[in-house]
């Protein structure tokens, strides 16, 4: 191996473990230069004389307010730091003033040692006042850090000023203290801003344009790839219109998380721009509507990708050669409803609609490309960043160079908008005309139609969102052209966005991201880029958030209180002295006057009691909401007072000062976290940082040979600061890196500046500070109100389950049969959007907690296996929330025909399905939070959803009986077992779940059913049904994973402990003669060892969509052992039981000429078994309401091969026992 190849290998290995891009390298360079210059200023005596009594604060503040971020982030950090300095300095001077008053008039004449000897009591009282002020400051510091991590940039400088000022001698004046803790701080902040603007400036507005273009590139690519994947079923077809083959499913699924992070980063950078002065033609706020549209576009693209995933399952592409990333990405449960749909029908429809979809896709892709070009020109982004689409064979996309200043003049935006509108209308018309050519069987509600509707609705909404983007781009282009006509000098303006409206001011004051940690605040960048490193701390979700978002009882109670408070007693008689206006006062509320003394006193007492009770309720609510703030406030106060109590005791104060007690408190405050983290791991990292920094400072000082060579000393410190800034800016270990960098300069300056300590003593005292201060912080955080990551993980997963239940209830409208004007109001959608955002943040926290749990000590065995289960749980919850977002936005945009027109008929079925889902999710929520097993019985949402689909299909047949019968004559004859067999009502009507339809007025309905089912609202319901099937399937999988984590309650004894009828059915088949004569011996059934062994026993042959006996298992959520039948058939007394062929029953083989088992016996045997996943295709087909005999290949209806698979399994078990 040559030297060059070895170096290349070493370089790749280095970049793998320590990734670094160009932006990070520039930021490290800026920060290192800034801190080095600050250290050089401390070495110059003339500059040090102007810095006051604490010149070592200059390098420290240069690290805290570092320039290694964008301009907006630096200004943001500077504003927060200055705010903390001002209030901290004022608070410290006030506390010292009161302490000096206790010393009397001699406070400025005597030293602290003399005060200790001459005025001990006064000196002790003054230190007691300082201690009280210190405790109040520490509690406020912890409270503010717990309220919002944004405020860490304010309260940390406040702590530094107050803590260090209280350590200074009490005989120093207020002017000396103000100079010591203002000049170096303000100089360090000014230097950071200077180097941020001079050396590699990063303007947020320019970065905003680049980020928006990058996000639109990914969105554009995802749209093209997903549409190509869906309609290009046969990539080898010569009539294929695309020049590229479809990408793999794995790559398509990975794009969802990528586009989500890109769009979120756009919003973050937009909020960061409010701190900047921008000199440009167009204000950055012009991108706000585009970014909002991109967020909605992300939801529709996720819907497109999900439909591609369903199509992949339906077309059974697993029979073909799969790419490795396809196999890795397709981690789906086996019992997918879509796998039982008819692929031929879907392919037939796609083949018809292929040209229509392609035409709109091509126009939409071209408009997206033009929009990116215009935005790149408007915000001075290099045109080379814009990616064009080259997957169209007849595509003619223009390309431009970077110096194309006349770019907008070559593009007619309005013409492109008109083309897109026309293409959208043509797509709707052609789609309607093409679909009208099919028979009603294809148009009826089915899994194929659900899949197609989901794709078409998301596709159209994507085109509508592109149209909205084009309108916004047109306004930006017009604004840019107007400003350009004024010339370069007058055209550009200075934009400052912080005080433009209340929203930007609120963001500036409080921030807009609840998931920001203190590390992100110190780092100054909120894009979550940690270069592959895991977070060491996570922000904890406020306890009151769950009550605000998920507690329906609280909101209802508020309404009750409000209503009760507004009730007034009616007047029964007219008060004295008010003889006039009788008609007015007779109907008015009771008015109490001064003459009614008794009533006034009674009312005043009631009002007093009500006010007192209201005050108690408010206090109780405040304490409940502020519980985590109290907890961390007490933690900070206890830890810091344990670490620094000697500074407030007269006898130990001087000793504590000599041992650098301020360092102990400084290390202790940085080791305390209001977040959940690996406490021992974080303490270890920060201890290593302090020791390494102090050792590097010692090395630098020794290399300078006792300050004889300060140049070499400075150069060596640079090599120690570079890795520190790398860990500060490029990894989540921010506070460990801060302590390491500060320790380098603090240890050196303690020996360089006039003091009694040499360099070795300073190194030892710094190590003592991390051992004592960090140890105290560790003890307090472990034993005083500890937070455990594994408990927080369960809480977050439980919270997400509650969010899903609440979103499902908000998504459902009209569950009581009432008439609703809109199926999704704006208010409900805003609530769903808010809950969805909180749930996604909770999932991000759960992912971090999952990694942190490995660092915690555990006594219950290894955590590795449980971590894999939690990984799957988080993934499934994310998929559920993603699909609820999609269907909610689709319903808001298009409505729902079933809710708005059929709700009076189908609402009991909708209510049962929604209630089942909500019940399941609430049961999971309580199981996770309480760590209790699941109950024995849980409702089946899958069956409820199938019944809803069947009822909608039946309602359509009742609404249009004549048209459907005419269309059905051309089609095949329905199967005998089909649900849609012409009956007006099914068996569930006898249970009172469905209301009879009023036949009056329906006979006059002559509308074409094709016209109805092609309405946008009905397509929206079809699309939501496809997503609802997926949601139910994921919920069942989540239920199974929950059983692994918390277990499930099972009946150990009694009738429900095992399926007794299974033994009866087995004996009826194997020993019919003995069974008839009453000589049967009950067999001992074997119970499953684990509730998840279903996949091991269902292994009789390969899976096939055309097979009559499907072997895929469907695990019902009702119990861990038994499986609920999908289609139980009641026993009919009119059937003739004499048609049994005992020979065939005993042989288990289908005869050629003999009659088989009667249909009633087979159905009855199926209904009494406890396995639903092992059904014949006839039963599955009957449930779905499809009646295609060619598709099912059910040639012999009475064949013995149609016996339930569960019955065959029992027979196989019996043979094994005999063997």
From Swiss-Prot:
Signal peptide: none annotated. Residues 1-36, 96-123, 168-183, 651-663, 706-709, 754-766, 818-1219 are cytoplasmic. Keywords: Membrane, Phosphoprotein, Transmembrane, Transmembrane helix. It holds the Pfam family FUSC_2. It is found in: Membrane. Residues 1096-1122 have a biased composition (Polar residues). The keyword Magnesium does not apply. The chain crosses the membrane at residues 37-57, 75-95, 124-144, 147-167, 184-204, 630-650, 664-684, 688-705, 710-730, 733-753, 767-787, 797-817. The modification Phosphoserine is found at residues 1167, 1198-1199. GO terms for cellular component: endoplasmic reticulum; membrane. Residues 969-982 have a biased composition (Basic and acidic residues). It comes from the Eukaryota. Residues 58-74, 145-146, 205-629, 685-687, 731-732, 788-796 are extracellular. Residues 567-602, 967-990, 1096-1125 are annotated as: Disordered. The modification Phosphotyrosine is found at residue 1191. It is a multi-pass membrane protein. Residues 575-602 have a biased composition (Low complexity). Present with 1080 molecules/cell in log phase SD medium. This is Uncharacterized membrane protein YGL140C. The lineage of its organism: Eukaryota, Fungi, Dikarya, Ascomycota, Saccharomycotina.
């Amino acid at each position: 191996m040559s030297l060059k190849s070895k170096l290349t290998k070493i370089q790749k290995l280095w970049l793998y473990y320590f990734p670094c891009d160009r932006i990070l390298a520039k930021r490290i360079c800026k920060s290192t230069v800034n801190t080095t210059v600050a250290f050089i200023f401390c070495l110059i005596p003339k500059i040090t004389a102007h810095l006051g009594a604490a010149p070592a604060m200059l390098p420290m503040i240069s690290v805290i307010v570092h320039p290694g971020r964008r301009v907006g982030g630096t200004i943001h950090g500077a504003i927060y730091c200055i705010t903390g300095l001002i209030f901290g300095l004022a608070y410290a001077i006030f506390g010292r003033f009161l302490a000096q008053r206790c010393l009397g008039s001699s406070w400025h004449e005597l030293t602290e040692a003399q005060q200790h000897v001459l005025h001990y009591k006064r000196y002790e009282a003054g230190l007691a006042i300082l201690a009280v002020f210190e405790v109040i400051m520490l509690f406020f510091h912890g409270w503010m850090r717990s309220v919002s991590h944004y405020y860490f940039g304010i309260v940390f400088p406040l702590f530094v000023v107050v803590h260090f000022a209280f350590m200074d001698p009490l005989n120093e004046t207020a002017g000396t203290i103000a100079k010591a803790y203002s000049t170096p701080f303000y100089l360090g902040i000014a230097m950071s801003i200077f180097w941020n603007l001079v050396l590699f400036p990063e303007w947020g507005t320019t970065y905003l344009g680049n980020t928006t273009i990058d996000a639109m590139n990914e969105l554009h690519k995802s749209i093209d790839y997903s549409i190509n994947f869906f309609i290009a079923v046969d990539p080898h077809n010569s009539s294929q219109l695309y020049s590229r083959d479809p990408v793999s499913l794995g790559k398509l699924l990975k794009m969802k998380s990528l586009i989500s992070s890109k769009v979120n980063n756009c919003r973050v950078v937009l909020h960061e721009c409010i701190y900047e002065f921008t000199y440009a033609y167009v204000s950055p706020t012009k991108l706000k509507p585009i970014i909002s549209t991109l967020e909605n576009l992300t939801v529709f693209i996720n819907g497109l990708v999900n439909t591609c995933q369903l199509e992949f399952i339906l077309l059974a592409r697993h029979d073909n050669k799969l790419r490795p990333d396809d196999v890795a990405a397709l981690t789906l449960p086996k019992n997918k409803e879509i796998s039982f749909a008819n692929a031929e029908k879907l392919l037939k429809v796609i083949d018809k609609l292929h040209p229509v979809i392609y035409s709109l896709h091509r126009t939409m892709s071209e408009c997206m490309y033009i929009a990116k070009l215009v935005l790149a020109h408007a915000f001075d982004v290099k045109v080379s960043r814009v990616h064009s689409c080259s997957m169209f064979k007849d595509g003619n996309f223009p390309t431009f160079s970077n110096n194309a200043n006349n770019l907008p003049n070559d593009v007619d935006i309005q013409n492109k908008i008109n083309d897109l509108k026309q293409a959208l209308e043509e797509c709707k018309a052609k789609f309607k005309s093409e679909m009208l050519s099919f028979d009603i069987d294809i148009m009826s509600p089915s899994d194929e139609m659900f899949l197609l509707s989901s794709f078409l609705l998301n596709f159209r909404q994507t085109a509508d969102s592109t149209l909205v983007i084009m309108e916004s781009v047109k306004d930006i282009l017009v604004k840019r052209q107007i400003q350009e006509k004024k010339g370069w000098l007058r055209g550009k303006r200075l934009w400052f966005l912080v005080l433009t409206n209340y929203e930007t001011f609120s963001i500036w004051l409080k921030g807009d991201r609840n998931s920001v940690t203190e590390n992100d605040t110190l780092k100054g960048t909120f894009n979550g880029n940690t270069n592959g490193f895991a977070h060491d701390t996570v922000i904890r979700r406020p306890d009151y958030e769950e009550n605000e978002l998920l507690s329906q009882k609280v909101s209802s109670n508020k309404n009750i209180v409000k209503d009760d408070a507004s009730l007034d007693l009616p007047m029964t008689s007219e008060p004295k002295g008010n003889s006039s206006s009788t008609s007015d006062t007779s109907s008015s509320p009771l008015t109490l006057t001064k003459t009614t003394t008794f009533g006034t006193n009674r009312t005043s007492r009631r009002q007093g009691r009500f006010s007192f009770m209201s005050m108690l309720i408010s206090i109780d609510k405040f304490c409940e909401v502020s519980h985590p703030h109290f907890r961390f406030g007490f933690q900070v106060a206890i830890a810091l007072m344990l670490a620094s109590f000697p500074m407030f005791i007269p006898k130990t104060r001087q000793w504590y000062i000599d041992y650098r007690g301020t360092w102990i408190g400084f290390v202790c405050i940085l080791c305390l976290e209001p977040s959940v983290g690996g406490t021992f791991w974080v303490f270890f990292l920060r201890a290593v940082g302090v020791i390494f920094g102090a050792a590097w400072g010692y090395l630098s000082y020794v290399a300078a040979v006792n300050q004889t060579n300060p140049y070499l000393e400075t150069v060596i410190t640079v090599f120690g600061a570079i890795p520190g800034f790398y860990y500060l800016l490029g990894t989540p270990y921010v506070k460990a890196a801060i302590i390491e960098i500060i320790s380098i300069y603090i240890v050196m300056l303690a020996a360089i500046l006039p003091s009694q300590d040499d360099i070795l003593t300073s190194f030892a005292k710094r190590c003592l500070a991390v051992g004592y201060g960090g140890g105290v912080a560790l003890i307090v955080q472990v034993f005083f109100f500890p937070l455990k990551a594994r408990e927080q993980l369960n809480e977050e997963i439980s919270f997400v389950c509650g969010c899903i239940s609440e979103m499902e209830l908000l998504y459902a409208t009209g569950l009581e049969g009432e008439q609703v004007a809109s199926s999704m109001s704006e208010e409900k959608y805003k609530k769903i959007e808010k809950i969805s955002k909180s749930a996604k943040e909770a999932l991000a926290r759960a992912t971090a907690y999952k990694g942190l749990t490995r660092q915690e000590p555990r006594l219950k065995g290894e955590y590795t296996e449980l971590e894999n289960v939690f990984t799957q749980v988080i993934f499934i919850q994310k998929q559920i929330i993603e699909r609820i977002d999609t269907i909610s936005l689709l319903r808001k945009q298009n409505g729902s025909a079933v809710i708005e027109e059929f709700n009076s008929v189908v609402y009991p079925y909708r209510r049962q399905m929604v209630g089942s889902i909500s019940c399941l999710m609430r049961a999971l929520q309580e199981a996770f939070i309480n760590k209790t097993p699941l109950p024995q019985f849980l409702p089946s949402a899958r069956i409820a959803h199938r019944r809803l689909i069947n009822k909608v299909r039946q309602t359509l047949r009742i609404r249009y009986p004549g048209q459907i019968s005419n269309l059905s004559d051309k089609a095949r004859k329905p199967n005998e077992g089909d649900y849609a067999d012409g009956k007006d009502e099914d068996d569930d009507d006898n249970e009172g779940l469905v209301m009879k339809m009023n036949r009056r007025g329906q006979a006059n309905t002559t509308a074409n059913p094709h016209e109805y089912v092609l309405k946008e609202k009905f397509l929206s319901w079809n699309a939501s049904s496809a997503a609802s099937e997926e949601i139910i399937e994921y919920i069942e999988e989540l239920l199974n994973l929950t059983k692994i984590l918390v277990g499930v309650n099972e009946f150990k004894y009694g009738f429900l402990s095992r399926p007794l009828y299974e033994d009866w059915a087995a004996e009826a088949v194997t020993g019919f003669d003995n069974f008839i004569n009453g000589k049967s011996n009950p067999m001992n059934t074997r119970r499953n060892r684990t509730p998840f062994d279903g996949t091991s026993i269902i292994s009789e042959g390969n899976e096939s969509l055309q097979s009559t006996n499907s072997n895929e298992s469907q695990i019902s959520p009702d119990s861990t052992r038994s499986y609920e039948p999908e289609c139980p058939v009641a026993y009919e007394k009119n059937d003739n039981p004499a048609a049994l062929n005992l020979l065939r029953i005993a042989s288990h083989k289908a005869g050629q000429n003999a009659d088989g088992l009667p249909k009633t016996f087979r159905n009855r045997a199926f209904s009494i078994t406890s396995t639903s996943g092992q059904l014949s295709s006839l039963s599955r087909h009957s449930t779905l309401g499809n009646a295609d005999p060619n598709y099912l290949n059910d040639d012999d209806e009475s064949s013995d091969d149609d016996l339930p698979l569960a019955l065959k399994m029992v027979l196989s078990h019996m043979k094994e026992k005999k063997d």
